[in-house]
Regions:
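Conserved phosphotransfer cores of two-component systems
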Residues: 60-62, 85-92, 114
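Active-site residues of response regulator receiver
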Residues: 70
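Receiver (REC) domain active-site loop signature in two-component systems and cognate sites
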Residues: 73
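Acidic catalytic/metal-coordinating carboxylates
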Residues: 51-54, 77-80
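Hydrophobic/aromatic residues positioned on beta-strands within the core alpha/beta folds
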Residues: 97-99
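C-terminal output helix
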Residues: 124-134
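Two-component/phosphorelay signaling modules centered on CheY-like receiver
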Residues: 28-47, 114
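Alpha4 helix (beta4-alpha4-beta5 surface) of REC/receiver domains from two-component response regulators
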Residues: 80, 101-120, 131
Length: 143
């Protein structure tokens, strides 16, 4: 076996259904952890962004399958960026993640009504993230 090969990965990669993912967070360390986790699940990180405005521009440029985005960021927050991305149809799904979303006065139900494909609280559950990605990889349609 090649010593440079990766460990066994979750099922989505094994069946060749790879999602193209844009990761957005204002904290570089969080962007890296989220991106590494998604790559471990067998999906492709097509880019990253540090805030909502950059996320909107990167989604337009990259056309990812999924945007995994923090909510509380300087400038344009994740909910506003999600709305812009979904209205422009530059990504199929947006998964919002946050540990501080309550301080913005937005509820989980509101996020889902506004079009979020999912919401995860930080620190996120890796198993739950893998499950969402696997489900979305099996369903390439727009939600």
């Amino acid at each position: 076996m090649n010593s440079g090969s990766k460990e066994q990965q979750p099922d989505a990669a094994a069946v060749g259904k790879k999602l193209r993912v844009l990761v957005v967070d204002d904290e570089p360390a969080v962007r890296e952890v989220v991106a590494d986790t998604i790559q471990f699940a067998g999906h492709e990180i097509v880019g990253t962004a540090k805030d909502g405005a950059e996320a909107v521009a990167r989604a337009e440029e990259l056309r990812p399958d999924v945007v995994v985005m923090d909510i509380k960021m300087p400038g344009m927050n994740g909910v506003d960026a999600m709305t812009a991305i979904l209205n422009a149809k530059t990504a199929k799904r947006v998964l919002l993640i946050s540990g501080e979303y309550r301080s913005l006065g937005v509820t989980r139900d509101e996020m889902m009504r506004q079009g979020a494909a999912g919401f995860m609280e930080k620190p996120f559950n890796v198993t739950e993230l893998f499950g969402l990605l696997e489900r979305w990889a099996g369903d390439r349609s727009v939600h």
